[in-house]
Regions:
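Flexible "arm" and connector segments at domain edges
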Residues: 1-107
């Protein structure tokens, strides 16, 4: 487990949210609703950034900060999904990274 998942685990403990539980339809849908909500907020900021790029050919510091915040929220709720169900997300991420790196072609 990496530092991010440890932080989320501490948050879930403090908020008396479930950790390392068996999957249930109810909890899966709840966790997915958190992800959906945060992805929508990120999408809204991306749309704002695209509009700003069309108007000024650059993205303001304010919008960049909002994008970073929303991206971090997506990561947080994804980590919460992993913590809730006891997924070894760090190992899985490492495997995905290794797989992606193996797809690189020289030259």
């Amino acid at each position: 487990m990496n530092a991010r998942e440890n932080q989320v685990r501490r948050f879930q403990q403090a908020m008396e949210q479930p950790i390392d539980i068996p999957m249930s339809s109810k909890e899966l849908m709840l966790r997915m609703s958190f992800i959906d909500e945060e992805v929508k907020e990120l999408r809204d900021e991306v749309v704002t950034a695209v509009k700003e790029l069309g108007d000024t050919a650059e993205v303001s510091h304010e919008i960049r900060v909002k994008l970073l915040k929303e991206l971090s929220d997506v990561m947080y709720v994804a980590s919460g999904f992993a913590v809730t169900f006891g997924f070894p997300i760090s190992r899985a991420f490492d495997r995905v990274h290794a797989s992606n790196m193996s797809k690189m072609v020289d030259g």
